[in-house]
Amino acid sequence: EELKWDYKVLKGKFFNEDELNTINKIANIVLPPNENGNINDAGVVELFEIIAKDFSTPAHNEYGEKVLRRGLIVFDQICQERFGSKLLECSDTQIKSVFDDIAFNDNTDENLQEAIRLFAVYRGMIITGYFTSEVGIKDLEYKGNTPNVWDGVPDDILKDYSVSYDEEWI
């Protein structure tokens, strides 16, 4: 049963091309490309697709539809109201102005509360997707569980405690 579900998740398609392009545009504005890599190298858009498909069940409260797709709808509505165009057709400057209004929980505009909650989900997934990828880990310069060079306790500290290393340790 689980293998059938995995196959469905891998082979199925949740978002259409416009939606995937919109997610890509959002992600590249939230976390712009740098010399270490970008959203595409990290597979962030693919992560959205996998999560949307895998969590689109009643057990997950139809997360893909009610949260991820709903976010795209809400962001498009705001852009349509402000600029007369869907998000994908807006300039980066226009989109950033929308994100500035919905990026923080301290905005008390009642009309933006849903967008604020949905943007928090998007931002979290973008950051998680990037920084858990090979590109993001390199960007962090994460070294993992690698030992440092350690030459022991400094001599002045050893003298303070009147101790020393045995010769065979040195």
Language model features with spans:
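Short amphipathic, basic-aromatic surface patches that mediate peripheral association
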Residues: 32-34
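C-terminal segment of N-terminal export signals and the immediately downstream linker at the start
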Residues: 1-25
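Mature-region segments of soluble proteins
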Residues: 7-9, 25, 36-170
